[in-house]
Design a protein with these regions (language model features):
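Conserved, structured core segments of small domains
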Residues: 1-95
């Protein structure tokens, strides 16, 4: 499953609050990777509506959605999640 991390409706945090949320967000993504729930995560290099992606390696979209929505950035409303079923073409994987 691929999760698009998009700008959320609540982006009016102070710089201190936003920096704190960013640290918690990165810790959350690190845990998802360490626990084997996510294969890769990362931001986009522009300031567009879609801020980044996470590719979840879990059996159901419900699990992917639950994991994505416990991200502190999502819980705060700074980001919102859009999840889709996704798979690599046969024979292609992450390197």
């Amino acid at each position: 499953f691929i999760a698009f991390l998009k700008k959320g409706p609540n982006r009016n945090q102070s710089k201190t609050e936003a920096d704190s949320l960013q640290k918690l967000h990165l810790a959350h993504l690190g845990r998802m990777y360490e626990l084997g729930f996510a294969d890769i995560s990362g931001p986009f290099g522009d300031d567009g509506e879609i801020r980044g992606i996470t590719i979840y390696n879990v059996p159901t979209i419900k699990i992917a959605d639950s994991l994505a929505n416990i991200d502190p950035m999502v819980k705060s409303g700074r980001l919102q999640i859009e999840i889709h079923s996704w798979w690599a073409a046969k024979g292609f994987g992450l390197r």
